């Protein structure tokens, strides 16, 4: 509701509402009010609020807020990625056995990697951007789960495969 006050003509893509097209079809808010809903519902303190802005089919800004840790991750295209105003950088570990990855494990064939599945893709991507995690692999995920975090990884010096921003779901993503 607050976002529509500042940019009332923007269209919206969100987990709760699907796609809501307004008069401006080139600019979108991409919203996930609670990424990690299952964690939240079970009292597991690992979930986030996610908002991204897409303009002309390109993610140009993103925000991931962890209300439990009071951590605000944000990124703006060509301006960097930050955590509470501190610049973020991806890790630079050279040995795979020293790395920690997050994945839903679906279709991942790297059994020798240190893997975790946290249940909150947005925070996992923010953690890749901040160097807490070294990589992220996920199949069949939704755009609202990864839009803000994918930009963060790129702005923190990382690499994200070319995700299809025209699809709202069934996205396969790799980031490091």
Regions found by a protein language model. Name each.
Residues 15-16, 32-35, 39, 124, ...:
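Acidic active-site catalytic centers that drive phospho-/nucleotidyl reactions
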Residues 89-176:
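An extended, acidic
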Residues 3, 12, 37, 66, ...:
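Residue-level signal for inorganic ion chemistry
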Residues 60, 87-90:
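Short, isolated positions in well-ordered beta-strands
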Residues 15, 65, 139:
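Conserved residues at the C-terminal ends of beta-strands
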Residues 23-82:
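DPxDG-like acidic metal-binding loop motif
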